[in-house]
Amino acid sequence: GAVFTSPTPDQIYEGIKAIATDKGVLMVIKNYTGDVMNFEMAGEMAQMDDIKVAQVVVDDDVAVDGSLYTVGRRGVAGTVFVHKIAGAKAEEGAELEEVQRVAQKVIDNVRTMGVAIRPCTVPAAGKPGFELGEDEMEVGIGIHGEPGTHKEKLRPADEIVDHLLDKILADIDYTGREVAVMVNSSGATPLMELFIINNHVADVLAEKGIKVYKTFVGEYMTSLEMEGFSVSLLRLDDEM
C-alpha cells in the first residue's frame, strides 16, 4: 500500500500465496480499521484456494481506546514482539494453531505508549499530520503520522518516561514479573537520547520490583522523520 495506508486485499492475497506452506499462514494485523478489513478479505480469498489461514489483531497501545482509525486500541511498536515470538514458534515447526496461540499470548501481555516532539510529513497530504510549537509535545501518538490524544508542554525526558510508564503499568500488573523492554525511535530520535530514556525506564522498573530480562533500544517501528519515541513492556513467562 501507499505510505501509511493498508495494502489492498489483492496485494495481501498475493503475499499469502507467496509464503504459504502446508501448515498455513498466520496474519499479524495491527488494529486499524482498514488493515483489519483488507487482511480479513485476503484471508477469505486464500481460504477459497484451500490455504489454511489464521489471524491475530495487535492492540498494544494504551493511549486510546478508539479513534478515527480504529475501533478499540491501536497496534503499535509492541507488534514487533508478536512477530519475533510467533516467528520463533513457527521456526520450531509448531502447528498454525500453536503459533496463533503464542502470538495472542504476546498481545495479551504487551503494552505500549509513545510521544513526539516533531511530527512527520504525510506524503499524500504533503504536510505534517499535526502542528507542534517549539515547547510542545504530542502525547499518545500512533504510527501513521496521526496526532496523539493531546498536547502538553515539553518536559524533561525523565518526566515524560514517568508519564508513559504510569499509563502502561496501570493497565496490567507487572509486579514481580520479568519483562522485555523496547525503547523505540519514531524515526529521527538518535540512539544517544534513546539510551538516556532507557536508563530512566530501567531505574523506574527496578524501583517497582519489575525485573528486566532483556532490553531493545533502537528503530524498530518508525514514522518517517517523526522525532519521538515509544516504550513497550512485555510481561514474560518461560514460553516467551
What are these regions (language model features)?
Residues 1, 7, 30-33, 57-63, ...:
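Short, ordered loop/turn segments at secondary-structure junctions
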Residues 1-23, 169:
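Glycine-rich oxoanion-binding loops at beta->alpha junctions
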Residues 2, 24-33, 40-43, 54-57, ...:
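Short glycine-rich or small-residue beta-strand-to-loop segments that form or flank ligand, phosphate
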Residues 2-10, 30-34, 69-77, 155, ...:
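Alpha-helix capping and helix-loop boundary segments enriched in small/acidic/polar residues
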Residues 21-22, 36-38, 51-98, 104-112:
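Active-site histidine-anchored catalytic micro-motif
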Residues 36-50, 69, 193-199:
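Short Gly/Thr/Asp-enriched flexible loops that form oxyanion-binding sites at enzyme active sites
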Residues 64, 90-196:
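Mixed-charge interfacial surface used for oligomerization/domain docking
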Residues 167-240:
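C-terminal non-catalytic interaction/assembly regions of soluble proteins
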